[in-house]
Amino acid sequence: MIKKLAPIALATLAYSNCSIATEQQVSKQWFNSIEYTHINNDYYDFDGYQLVSHYYFEEQQSSGVLDDYGYLDTDTNFRVNYSGGDYYNDIGLSGEYFFNNWFAVADMRDVRDLDNYTLGLGYLFADALKVSVNRDVRSYGDDYFRLKAQYNLQINDKDYLGFSAETDDELDVWNVSARYFNHLSGSHYITVDVGHQDSLYNSASNAMISYYFGDHYAIGAGLDDSELVLQGKYFINDKYYLTANYTESGSAELYNLKFVAQF
């Protein structure tokens, strides 16, 4: 039980040393992260890692906390990621290009496999509703169209409700999600994330609630397909922060550490 509560305990102890809160509203354009995941169960261990660099061609304004920059991406952006583990490694590229309210989508899961990619076209309505039609091409299995919609309801200058829905052209695979972002007072915020995914063979739901306090700390707890998830975050300053996650899944335990640098 102690190891499950470690992220929360560390954040709570550190809070006693935090200074008077100030709201963290900053602008960033370039987001980079390095992530390590370890899975341990009765039968095997697995180690995985991921490097991500995500660049926006316009500055992104934070919502008040240092890891939230709004629900919708509405500016041209480009992303490169490298993921690897005990049995694989991939180099992926993706991006969106905006021209007025129209935008084009491109995604390649692994640059060494040009037979698997996504191309799409979408439209942004009033900076609040983002709709796109995407074509997923696969070297194994059928190609298919995918429809995606995202909506941001801005409650005030900080609080918002975000909704997303996505499905294939035959409605066999679909997912929905929502995010609530609320400014309580000072530098105290709360976020609630919920989602559900459904396919021909299985379905899963998830939920997470996070609480931000002071300038440097956040804790969270939730469920991922009925499995316990605990999270702690430490914001070193407006450029760097750390995230630690623990997930209990049956006889397996998942540990995740991530370091983010944003400029």
What is each model feature region?
Residues 128, 140-222:
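Detector for outer-membrane/organellar transmembrane beta-barrel domains
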Residues 1-31, 42-45, 60-72:
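Cleavable N-terminal export/targeting peptides
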